[in-house]
UniProtKB/Swiss-Prot annotation:
Cofactor note: The endonuclease active site can probably bind other divalent cations.
Entry comment on modification after translation: Phosphorylated.
A Gene Ontology BP annotation from the UniProt entry: symbiont-mediated perturbation of host apoptosis
Gene encoding the protein: NS1
SF3 helicase domain segment(s): 367-529
Task of the protein: Multifunctional protein which displays endonuclease and helicase activities required for initiating and directing viral DNA replication. Also plays a role in viral packaging and transactivation of several promoters. Binds site-specifically to 2-3 approximate tandem copies within the origins of replication (Ori), unwinds this hairpin region and nicks one DNA strand thereby initiating the rolling circle replication (RCR). Cooperatively binds Ori with host PIF and probably other host factors, which activate the nickase function of NS1.
Residues at which ATP binds: 400-407
PV NS1-Nuc domain sequence ranges: 21-260
Stated name of the protein: Initiator protein NS1
Organism: Mink enteritis virus (strain Abashiri) (MEV)
Reactions this protein catalyses: ATP + H2O = ADP + phosphate + H(+)
EC number from the UniProt entry: 3.1.21.-, 3.6.4.12
Region of interest (DNA-binding), residue spans: 1-277
Classification lineage: Viruses, Monodnaviria, Shotokuvirae, Cossaviricota, Quintoviricetes
Length: 668
């Protein structure tokens, strides 16, 4: 239907409701129960005593006019509802308005500054009652209970004044006490779940009228059904409106206030289970936590540098220090449970530098090359441990003399991981206080385990154990790889003055033994922070996955305590810029380990064929001198040939043409 088919009265009612749609209003209910005082029955319709009050008389006359004008054509309402009930409703309407005006005067509020709506209804169980909606900018939610008490007082006083039953002064006082104590005026409230107290609940003025009051039917049979008698409001929009027009206003208001597009929201199972509204503080903390995890923030210093705004925001809140600590603990816990140390290192690899990365010339591999080791094999074994694939051998042990590169390799690995916990030997009672929720445990300069040997063995083997923390309860350490450096023999455990050899083999079974003995030059420097990410990326690129199955595929067996890192030997050309494929030589094939023959140039051939120079001292004399120094007699020493004799014998066996032909064959 088009808007032109509706009456002006209907459209004005719709616009008035839309104007006050979102206004918050108090919702009061007035009632009048049947009571008995000393055998005298006082019913709800016994309050029609005439009174000489022009204002009250004028209000009653206005309510009477409104009821007469809204009667239906069939006159069913007139025939079913007796005149006494109609007169009582009109009187109650005047009394309620009188109570409102008296409250306005007590609060110094002008009546034209308030918006109100009154509807008298009849219920099967409750009988007569009246709903009152009241909105004013000068009335706050906290004043709701005070307003109820004031209206209840005025309401009881007017009821006693207009009671048509002949009551004594004592009975009148008793009637007023009953009205006030029984709360014949109530206000809409809700009960708080935590405090278990009742608080005033505000309603939307326009929505409440359109969706609730205007949809009710007009009362026809007081004993058979429920409905409304009369409606009045401060805007005079529904005082004289008929029943059909009221429904039309409600329908139009509902259609016009309906949102144009309905957003479809998907509620997850977790949100349904939570069943509560998240506060802005919770949402802010969750957003901050996601940012910290994505940026791999694991310390307060990293947080200050990478996310200073969120750090200051939390620090400024009440209990900010605890909030920062707990948020950071959740971040480290998330990284420890979802990522391995190898994965955290691999994330930091610069792929643009990987193309020209020379593994053999990296500082870490230079240290391994000094010992004649297969540096790829060593790096592959370390990567497996960092990825929690070493099984019981969950610890990388760098040991040996000072200045051999133990700490600089361990430090580079720890910096690349980031989320690292350090063992504190000075804290005798709580040495692993910093090692919970970490991706790597770093033990620098480990010494005698002593009475903590069992804890060490459990952590070094990757077991889940619980440890005590200072000022807190016990906390669980999940399987975490360990990197350890030491100058001592940690396999020897001393408790007091007694050695415990039974711990030696279990400790060896838990260690990836890397013994460094070659002292580094003073200008060797530190390992670059980008080196280990590139090493891990290089291993993955060339098929050396960080799993023990892949390790045994390449190197034949799992690493042991006395692992020979020099076998199989590796060619010096490996990983040179022009080398594409990696080739290793098996230790079981001795021929493959022979050095490549160096071609001889012609000048070298001529030098070999020239006559040898004769030493001043014969070999026999040198032998005699050495034998005399050792206390050996000349008889026991066999005479050695001179250089001239050796040269003559060689030339007698091989001619110059034969020697030159052999050298040419080698060159080919």
């Amino acid at each position: 239907m088009s808007g032109n088919q509706y009456t002006e009265e209907v459209m004005e009612g719709v616009n008035w409701l839309k104007k006050h749609a979102e206004n918050e209003a108090f919702s009061f209910v007035f009632k009048c129960d049947n009571v008995q005082l000393n055998g005298k029955d006082v019913h709800w319709n016994n309050y029609t005593k005439p009174i000489q009050n022009e204002e009250l008389t004028s209000l009653i006359r206005g309510a009477q006019t409104a009821m007469d004008q809204t009667e239906e054509e069939e006159m069913d309402w007139e025939s079913e509802v007796d005149s006494l009930a109609k007169k009582q409703v009109q009187t109650f309407d005047a009394l309620i308005k009188k109570c409102l005006f008296e409250v306005f005067v007590s609060k110094n509020i002008e009546p034209n500054e308030c918006v109100w709506f009154i509807q008298h209804e009849w219920g099967k169980d409750q009988g007569w009652h009246c709903h009152v909606l009241l909105h004013s900018k000068n009335l706050q939610q906290a004043t709701g209970k005070w307003l109820r008490r004031q209206m209840n007082m005025y309401w009881s006083r007017w009821l006693v004044t207009l009671c048509s039953v002949n009551l004594t002064p004592t009975e009148k006082i008793k009637l007023r006490e009953i009205a006030e104590d029984s709360e014949w005026v109530t206000i809409l409230t809700y009960r708080h779940k935590q405090t278990k107290k009742d608080y005033v609940k505000m309603v939307h003025f326009g929505n409440m009228i359109a969706y609730y009051f205007l949809t009710k039917k007009k009362i026809v049979h007081m004993t058979k059904e429920s409905g409304y008698f009369l409606s009045t409001d401060s805007g005079w929009k529904f005082n004289f409106m008929k029943y059909q027009d009221r429904h039309t206003v409600s329908t139009l208001y509902t259609e016009q206030m309906k949102p144009e597009t309905v957003e479809t929201t998907v509620t997850t199972a977790q949100e349904t289970k939570r069943g509560r509204i998240q506060t802005k503080k919770e949402v802010s903390i969750k957003c901050t936590l996601r940012d910290l995890v994505s940026k791999r923030v694991t310390s307060p210093e990293d947080w200050m540098m990478l996310q200073p705004d969120s750090y200051i925001e939390m620090m400024a809140q009440p209990g900010g220090e605890n909030l920062l600590k707990n948020t950071l603990e959740i971040c480290t816990l998330t990284l420890a449970r979802t990522k391995t140390a190898f994965e955290l290192i691999l994330e930091k690899a610069n792929n643009t530098k990987l193309t020209n990365f020379d593994l053999a010339n990296s500082r870490t591999c230079q240290i391994f090359r000094m010992h004649g080791w297969n540096w790829i094999k060593v790096c592959h074994a370390i990567a497996c441990v960092l990825n929690r694939q070493g099984g019981k051998r969950n610890t990388v042990l760098f040991h040996g003399p000072a200045s051999t590169g133990k700490s600089i390799i361990a430090q580079a690995i720890a910096q690349a991981v980031g989320n690292v916990g350090c063992y504190n030997a000075a804290n005798v009672n709580f040495p692993f206080n910093d090692c919970t929720n970490k991706n790597l445990i770093w033990i620098e300069e480990a010494g005698n385990f002593g009475q903590q040997v069992n804890q060490f063995k459990a952590i070094c083997s990757g077991q889940t154990i619980r440890i005590d923390q200072k000022g807190k309860g016990s906390k669980q350490i999940e399987p975490t790889p360990v990197i350890m450096t030491t100058n001592e023999n940690i396999t020897i455990v001393r408790i007091g003055c007694e050695e415990r050899p039974e711990h030696t083999q279990p400790i060896r079974d838990r260690m990836l033994n890397i013994k460094l003995v070659c002292k580094l030059p003073g200008d060797f420097g530190l390992v670059d922070k980008e080196e280990w990410p590139l090493i891990c990326a290089w291993l993955v690129k060339h098929g050396y996955e960080s799993t023990m199955a892949n390790y045994t595929h390449h190197w034949g067996k799992v690493p042991e305590w006395d692992e020979n890192w020099a076998e199989p030997k590796i060619q010096e050309g490996v990983n040179s810029p022009g080398c594409k494929d990696l080739e290793t030589q098996a230790a079981s094939n001795p021929q493959s380990q022979d050095h490549v023959l160096t071609p001889l140039t012609p000048d070298v051939v001529d030098l070999a064929l020239e006559p040898w120079s004769t030493p001043d001292t014969p070999i026999a004399e040198t032998a005699n001198q050495q034998s005399n120094q050792l206390g050996v007699t000349h008889k026991d020493v066999q005479a050695s040939p001179t250089w001239s004799e050796i040269e003559a014998d060689l030339r007698a066996i091989f001619t110059s043409e034969q020697l030159e032909e052999d050298f040419r064959d080698d060159l080919d």
